[in-house]
From Swiss-Prot:
List of residues binding progesterone: 764, 770, 811, 939
Bilayer disposition of the protein: Peripheral membrane protein
Name of the encoding gene: Nr3c2
Name of the protein: Mineralocorticoid receptor
Positions where Phosphoserine occurs in the chain: 250, 259, 283, 287, 299
Tissue and organ distribution: Expressed in heart and kidney.
GO CC term, one of those recorded: endoplasmic reticulum membrane
Ranges of the DNA-binding region feature: 603-666
Annotated family: Belongs to the nuclear hormone receptor family. NR3 subfamily.
Binding positions for aldosterone per the UniProt entry: 764, 770, 811, 939
NR LBD domain ranges (all copies): 720-958
Organism: Mus musculus
Location in or out of the cell: Cytoplasm; Nucleus; Endoplasmic reticulum membrane
Assembly behavior: Heteromultimeric cytoplasmic complex with HSP90, HSP70, and FKBP4, in the absence of ligand. After ligand binding, it translocates to the nucleus and binds to DNA as a homodimer and as a heterodimer with NR3C1. Binds the coactivator NCOA2. May interact with HSD11B2 in the absence of ligand. Binds the coactivators NCOA1, TIF1 and NRIP1.
Pro residues biased stretches: 688-697
Amino acid sequence: METKGYHSLPEGLDMERRWSQVSQTLERSSLGPAERTNENSYMEIVNVSCVSGATPNNSTQGSSKEKHELLPCLQQDNSRSGILPSDIKTELESKELSATVAESMGLYMDSVRDAEYTYDQQNQQGSLSPAKIYQNMEQLVKFYKENGHRSSTLSAISRPLRSFMPDSGTSMNGGALRAIVKSPIICHEKSPSVCSPLNMPSSVCSPAGINSMSSSTASFGSFPVHSPITQGTSLTCSPSVENRGSRSHSPVHASNVGSPLSSPLSSMKSPISSPPSHCSVKSPVSSPNNVPLRSSVSSPANLNNSRCSVSSPSNTNNRSTLSSPTASTVGSIGSPISNAFSYTTSGASAGAGAIQDMVPSPDTHEKGAHDVPFPKTEEVEKAISNGVTGQLNIVQYIKPEPDGAFSSSCLGGNNKINPSSPFSVPIKQESSKHSCSGASFKGNPTVNPFPFMDGSYFSFMDDKDYYSLSGILGPPVPGFDSSCEGSAFPGGIKQEPDDGSYFPETSIPSSAIIGVNSGGQSFHYRIGAQGTISLSRSPRDQSFQHLSSFPPVNALVESWKPHGDLSSRRSDGYPVLEYIPENVSSSTLRSVSTGSSRPSKICLVCGDEASGCHYGVVTCGSCKVFFKRAVEHNYLCAGRNDCIIDKIRRKNCPACRLQKCLQAGMNLGARKSKKLGKLKGLHEEQPQQPPPPPPQSPEEGTTYIAPTKEPSVNSALVPQLASITRALTPSPSMILENIEPEIVYAGYDNSKPDTAESLLSTLNRLAGKQMIQVVKWAKVLPGFKNLPLEDQITLIQYSWMCLSSFALSWRSYKHTNSQFLYFAPDLVFNEEKMHQSAMYELCQGMRQISLQFVRLQLTFEEYSIMKVLLLLSTVPKDGLKSQAAFEEMRTNYIKELRKMVTKCPNSSGQSWQRFYQLTKLLDSMHDLVNDLLEFCFYTFRESQALKVEFPAMLVEIISDQLPKVESGNAKPLYFHRK
């Protein structure tokens, strides 16, 4: 049974008796782990001292080659490298003093062991005050000063240093683990020396700065990590330096050293090192013949920690940790300057392993060396690994980040310690934030080499003659009443099956393949593009077929029927409802149709984010305010009226910005009509009052209650389908609104002075551009293509001036409220320009028509139908080839105008009166057109002399119309007799 003995022998006992007791004690302590119990480790105070010059195997290396670090309190002369016979008495007296110190330190250990330490305590005072701790040290120092102590030389170097290591399991129950460290059996020239207070190169041990090194896993700082055997290189810890792993013990700053992470049950209870040994190694005085070394290292509760440092004898030149004879050339553990942790290993010889609390480094790890781990204190993944003597793993810690949750961020998936790694826990490494898990992108994005085609109904990409009416009109297309059962995309929709079973009929190189989607946008596929591509027709061959965008009613009704494959179909961008649930209200359907998936609105003028619909166009607030103020000014462009207007450059040119606003369709009258629409909606939303109940007969005295029938699902769907059918059925007014020509720019050059010739030439060029738009508009007019081509050309030739002047009056009414003549966004006539154009009276006549629009508050639906009637208002006297078709078409549009007038909330009398005023306005256009044609014919004849230019389109029309009008072959159609 292992016991704990404290030797306090009287001072006058014989020295030989003490040496024999020491030998017996050490022999009794050398029992194996099987002969020990779970009691605390046997404690003996071992004081090992040596002369720095004692190097048995290399005596030529004297003290002159060494730098000795002297204790500040012991300024002794260390020049002597040998031991005199007269020093034996001094050695015996020092042994007696060591026994006294051992007794006092044993009492100190009992007090410290019973003390309770908190977990986070760093500088807590133990049961023994610092004064008492220092008192023993002071007595020892005094004794050395009085007696002129000299350390003895270890004469028997070949004798093994017997040390003892208790079973590490003895500290499992919370007791303080005192690891008895074994030193190498044979110490030769490369082994670190066991130094006396005079020659201790690896520690500074004055009472003012005693370094009781305690490595802690919580802080590495700038202090080295110490093994349980040696303290490493010299390190002076001043009182001002605070380190969780190293404390300064002086009379002022003396404290019981405890690990900052130690638990209350397993506190670090290491004795304070005495000045001669400066370690927690408690040993009797070393014998020249037999130096049994026994270091007591305290490790609290699996704390991988070292408290003391003991240098083995010989070779004081080598500042290294305790090493095996084969690995003694390793440098120090750490330096406060470099902060580099270099670990050494100790080899095992003759069955006595040298135990070090160090991680083997790849440079010093040798074959045959095995390491015994000390228990660790940190919990990794809530698993405590208790070191056992048989295990070969070294438990060293690198303090992780405060979060502690580094299991998922470490490279390893487990906590297995790699023997070849200097760290037991894998070092945390941040994952790359730029790593990509997907496959790399293959191929370059296709670039569209073709500009986005205009989405309007009119395109200038026809292969026909631009300056020929017959060329523009071309072959007839299906009329308004034609069937729309066919596909809405004559060129076919691009299909790309995955199996590659479809191939185009013609063999075309992949680099020349062009696809056109339903919106008219072209796509150019690069060479080597995978997948099959169906060829669409060329944009030049596309003929305008607006009617294909309006589905027939029967097709719409059929789409409501449930189909098995309806969910897998695509509806060309329009959602197709499979069924209508019973409990779905109109507000729910409205919220679904106007969901968050709709793209954000963009200003049609500058491209900025739109704030709403202003003056009839979706624009931003900036363009709204600009248009409101700009219509009152006459801006001039410093360039060629083609400035870029976008979000950044919209303020550069107000003329081009106003021109773009007008081109987008902004007008001041839209605000008034919007207010009228709101008032109209309020009248319509007023609930109708239920009819009063029938008067009750007093004779009968009975009350009749009308039978109420709850609507079923079918009866509720029928009116909904009927209303949807009526709403989606394209009316002529809806079609006319969709095919309305866009505003054309005149290309007016304001840098030149305004003259009659330049203004008239500009008006003629503008009229030529507008005529192209008029011909294209008439080509898609419902019912107009049913007429023979010759009749179509004749009607356009007779009515072109009437259509141009009527459209001018509408633009002036919408954009300037009939204050100016709005020929184009870049050409607006005020009074001055009217005089300069040499046609002031004609301009005033056209302005009067525009003022009539203001008086009647003409709507766009009325205007569009009236314009069609003006196209059909002049015919040859001999009549047309298909007069019947012409009469039918004209009658249909007159009826449509009548319906449009009756839609107003006015009474029937007021609607007829409005119809009369509108038709009267149409009749007044003939008188104005006659005057305009007369002036036009005159300038056409005298164009050479007047230097007035006429475009090719007008030359063709006027050349055919002039002889017919002058011969009286033109017959205007009036609604009212003069």
